[in-house]
Curated annotation (Swiss-Prot):
It catalyses: Release of an N-terminal octapeptide as second stage of processing of some proteins imported into the mitochondrion. It holds the Pfam family Peptidase_M3. This is Mitochondrial intermediate peptidase. GO terms for biological process: intracellular iron ion homeostasis; peptide metabolic process; protein processing involved in protein targeting to mitochondrion; protein stabilization. The lineage of its organism: Eukaryota, Fungi, Dikarya, Ascomycota, Saccharomycotina.
């Protein structure tokens, strides 16, 4: 899942020469050290860096430059991600203010030069892109810190930084002079014939964003636009911050309902909470209060035979606070107002204008066709729900499919699924614990093997310096190294044990060629803020992958004493999929290297950006990949295909229903941003009524009671484009069958995929990329026929 926040139009002292030499020497030492090892040794080293805490600690100590490093920074270290300014929360705020001044100075110089010389016009797009990078360098790292950093002081500083930068970025969105200068040079053949294709692509992208930001409006309306956009951003931050909040953290049931629960262990646990529950405060002896934190509510949903108890717990667990729904209603209404101001039928029309899908009508057609296929297909949704229903009423022969879909409620799902799984297990031998073949290090090492095979790219661990990460005990740094060119592609910072964040991919720095040749920035200046390539001509992309995996067993000995190396973090098949998925985003960022940052890596259209990550899930599900990668963490025995097949068969019990549920979420995203909000009156909009009405129509596990939609983060981050996952899944299926089906380790297929899709970032029409990858010219038009082809089952 991509988390970004800051495209330009959406969104000091120098390090000593001595330090520079030491950093370069350290890099050369590590690179040479790696090259002396065999590939097998290097993969084992990579595995141990993640799986063995003591080994990692020694590696970090032995890999760091001399101790004089810290004294050069007054003991504070090199700063987060090697950005000198980010040594403290106040440093982040100072960096934002310095960057703001740097941006204003750049704008002033650009505007003076574009009006007075041809050279100023020729350099204008490069400098506009540089301006974007100056701002993104602040807002992207601030967003990462706000969401992921363990220190509240850093989080507070990130929030202040976001507010400082976002207002200025929105002012740039509606800067008429910036826009007119760009518009005029893009229609001047004397200039465009001397620009690179990438410069023109970025220029057109920025022009579109200007125009979509209401540049044609009168000054008062433009000012309102900026104010509303900023308010939407702040509402979105509040929405995401409260995504896990509940309306209440207790669910009360009657004592008679409690008595019907047969699980004595759960009853005992619930009873133990009563002294701290609302019952003790209200002296409510007639009810029992179930805590909604911890494992108890989930145990009830999967094991409790009392439907009324499951119903109450499920609704309570899915209810959002009223304030959260108010926040959702507010930003959806503001979005509708913005779309109306810009002359669009709806926010969805506004969002999709330049996406692959083109318009909401195409999206709804895609979703309806998908849902119809899932309902009607053999072994589809109806068959899956029928299997569940047989454990509810015993015999469903007298009921129609529609009646069965209506009868199986959302609070029945986990309970009936547990019954189905239990019955399935009775018919089979006990399954071996497959997670013992999937340590974190084994999977990362396996990914390096895969990337070397298909891309000729290695993942090489690098020791971090003091202050470079937010948790030196658990964050690992990888150099993504291209063997073909013998160059670094960029850096990954991986934190698999974050207590705060769902699996996420954060862009910290984008690829960009420095503008040293035109004199608008210097290497000395940039060296303090970013990590540069070997020739110091490009800033290297920096990506952070953060997951919330459980720490290895035996870690309770203290934060600074290290984790028990005897048993590493072991992964389920779902968690393996997640890491493959997020690494798909990361490799897109690394391979999609461009000279201009606005369209580098994952900065492509939103309904294309999930393709690389979704495609990686095809690799993670293929036994030819997993069985070559997986090894038992103790015995080093490989995983057998038979064992994997047995476990995978249990994962597909509700596979079609899962896809249907995702299509419901995508449909909700569309109807909350459609033209009805404008036509029926923005003032009277009620997202809960819309949600319940849609659920009633779509039927499968229909939720007509809770306010779960307040827990759906993509309603803000992916507003009107959540369908992207489903579209990109269809595209990924085509790519897999067209390139990798015969051999998922194929270098030829990997090279074709790199050359046709990954390397372009967002600088090429995605439909043209697909036409190239699949050898089908019809796709290059990107019309309704192309959408139809992609929607066809392979």
């Amino acid at each position: 899942m991509r988390v970004t926040s800051s495209r330009l139009l959406q969104g000091g002292s120098l390090v000593s020469r001595v330090l520079k030499r030491r950093l370069n020497n350290a890099s050369r030492t590590k690179k040479g050290w790696f090259s002396t090892r065999t590939l097998a040794d290097s993969n084992e080293h990579l595995r141990r860096v993640f799986d063995d805490q003591a080994y990692f600690d020694n590696f970090t100590k032995s890999g760091a430059p001399e101790g004089a490093m810290n004294s050069l920074f007054g003991g504070n270290g090199v700063g987060l991600f090697r950005n000198r300014a980010l040594i403290s929360p106040q440093g982040l705020v100072d960096f934002s203010e310095e960057s703001l001044e740097r941006a204003k100075m750049l704008v002033s110089n650009m505007m003076a030069e574009v009006k007075t010389s041809e050279q100023g016009r020729l350099e204008y797009i490069k400098k506009l892109d540089q301006l974007s990078d100056v701002l993104c360098r602040v807002i992207d790292v601030a967003e990462f810190i706000r969401v992921s950093h363990p220190s509240q002081k850093w989080v507070d500083a990130a929030q202040r930084t976001h507010e400082i930068m976002f207002e200025y970025m929105n002012q740039l969105n509606t800067n008429v002079e910036l826009y007119e200068s760009l518009r005029d040079l893009l229609i001047d053949p004397a200039i465009t014939t001397k620009l690179s294709k990438e410069e023109i692509e970025v220029g057109e992208y920025l022009r579109q964003d200007f125009e979509r930001s209401g540049i044609h409006m009168d000054p008062n309306t433009r000012n309102n636009f900026v104010a509303i956009t900023q308010e939407i951003s702040l509402l979105g931050s509040h929405f995401n911050n409260d995504i896990h909040s509940l309306e209440s953290y207790w669910c009360n049931i009657s004592r008679s309902e409690f008595d019907k629960i047969s699980d004595t262990v759960v009853k005992s646990e619930i009873y133990g909470y009563q002294s701290s529950s609302p019952a003790s405060q209200n002296k409510d002896s007639g009810n029992i209060y179930i805590p909604l934190a911890g494992h108890i509510p989930y145990t009830i949903l999967s094991k409790c035979e009392v439907e009324s108890v499951r119903r109450k717990v499920w609704i309570s667990l899915h209810n959002s606070p009223k304030e959260q729904i108010d926040t959702l209603n507010a930003f959806v209404k503001y979005r509708a107002l913005l779309a109306k101001m810009l002359g669009y039928k709806s926010f969805a029309h506004y969002q999709l204008e330049h996406k692959m899908a083109k318009n909401p009508e195409n999206v709804l057609t895609l979703l309806r066709n998908l849902q119809q296929g899932l309902i009607s297909k053999e072994y589809g949704v109806c068959e899956e729900v029928k299997k569940l229903h047989s454990f509810k009423n015993g015999d469903d022969a007298v009921m129609t499919d529609e009646e069965i879909l209506e009868d199986v409620k959302p609070w029945d799902r986990e309970y009936l699924l547990a019954q189905l799984q239990s019955q399935t297990l009775k018919d089979e031998e006990p399954l071996e614990d497959i997670s013992e073949y999937f340590s974190v290090g084994t999977i990362v090492s396996g990914l390096s093997k895969l990337f070397y095979s298909i891309y000729n790219v290695n993942l090489i661990p690098e020791a971090t310096l003091k202050g470079e990460t937010w948790d030196s005990n658990q964050v690992r740094k990888l150099n993504v190294f291209d063997v073909t060119s013998n160059k670094k592609l960029g850096y990954l910072y991986l934190d698999f044990w974050s207590p705060k964040v769902l699996p996420s991919h954060f862009t910290i720095v984008c690829s960009r060629k420095l503008n040293t040749d035109i004199g608008s920035e210097s290497r000395d200046e940039m060296r303090e803020m970013v990590q540069l390539d070997e020739n110091e001509q490009h800033q290297l992309p920096v990506i952070s992958l953060v997951c919330n995996l459980s720490k290895p067993q035996g870690t309770g000995v203290g934060r600074f004493t290290g984790m028990d190396s005897r048993k590493p973090t072991l992964l389920s098949l779902d968690q393996v999929d997640t890491i493959f998925h997020e690494m798909g985003h990361a490799m897109h960022s690394m391979i999609g290297k461009t000279d201009l940052h606005n369209l580098s890596g994952t900065r492509c259209v939103t309904d294309f950006v999930e393709l690389p990550s979704v495609l990686m899930e095809s690799f993670s599900k293929d036994p030819r990949v997993l069985c070559k990668i997986a090894k038992h963490y103790r015995t080093k025995e490989p995983l057998s295909k038979e064992t994997l097949a047995k476990h995978q068969s249990h994962r597909v019990l509700l596979e079609e229903s899962e896809t249907f549920m995702q299509s419901k979420m995508a449909m909700l995203d569309q109807v909350l941003h459609n033209e009805d909000i404008i036509n029926c009156g923005i003032k009277d909009f009620d997202s809960t009524a819309v949600y319940h009405h849609l659920e009633s129509q779509l039927k499968v596990f229909a939720d007509k009671w809770s306010t779960w939609h307040g827990k759906f983060p993509h309603l803000f981050s992916y507003g009107a484009v959540y369908y992207s996952y489903l579209l990109d899944r269809a595209i990924a299926e085509k790519i897999w069958h067209g390139l990798f089906k015969d051999d998922p380790w194929s270098r030829e297929a990997g090279q074709k995929y790199k050359d046709s899709i990954l390397k372009w970032g967002g600088t090429r029409d995605p439909w043209v990329c697909l036409a190239d990858a699949l050898g089908d010219e019809r796709l290059g038009k990107g019309d309704s026929k192309a959408m139809e082809i992609i929607g066809q089952k392979v």
